[in-house]
């Protein structure tokens, strides 16, 4: 049965995305003792999938390889920054920069599986030609409640003495280009 959800896709911050998604030791140290929105005891419930075609490079290396390939194939540098130009009517038009790696956050339910999200990624690839490179299910994020939850709140639960309201979601990192059409990187 299909369920409704939402996803917000934007250019991926390749320098910090993997640290957050993989919960690296350095990332966990940097968010500090307060663990504002992550409960480490719940991190074992997180799941991940890396597209076998992606290989074992990290996102920044992959991004740098794309930049180099664009330069080799087109003779020009990849246009990364947003820029403005004047239209025929004299109005200023913003032109988006190229973002070959993008990340979307998909809202999920507590019982959503990695297979469910992979199926969603496959549908995105079929419909729009965007390739899922990495998928991370996060079931350890949320926020602490002040006191007990409302009676109709069925998701919050107790961790020690405090009540926690989970924010179940999945991060999907998409490749937004094809090897054959490097000069036609999608920028919208």
Mark where each language-model region is.
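Short "domain-exit" segments at the C-terminal end of structured domains
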Residues: 184-188
């Amino acid at each position: 049965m299909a369920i409704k959800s939402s996803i917000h896709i934007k250019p991926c911050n390749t320098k910090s995305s993997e640290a957050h998604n993989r919960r690296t030791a350095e990332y966990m140290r940097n968010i500090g003792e307060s663990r504002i929105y992550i409960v480490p005891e719940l991190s074992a419930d997180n799941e991940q999938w890396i597209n076998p075609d992606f290989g074992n490079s990290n996102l920044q290396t992959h991004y740098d390889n794309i930049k180099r390939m664009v330069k080799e194939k087109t003779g020009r540098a990849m246009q990364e920054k947003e820029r403005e130009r004047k239209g025929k009517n004299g109005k200023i038009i913003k032109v988006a920069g190229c973002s070959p790696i993008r990340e979307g956050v998909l809202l999920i339910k507590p019982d959503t599986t990695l297979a469910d999200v992979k199926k969603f990624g496959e549908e995105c690839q079929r419909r729009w030609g965007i390739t899922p490179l990495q998928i991370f299910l996060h079931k350890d994020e949320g926020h602490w409640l002040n006191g007990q939850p409302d009676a109709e709140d069925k998701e919050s639960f107790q961790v020690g003495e405090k009540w926690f309201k989970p924010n179940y979601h999945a991060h999907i990192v998409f490749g937004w280009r094809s090897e054959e059409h490097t000069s036609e990187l999608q920028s919208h």
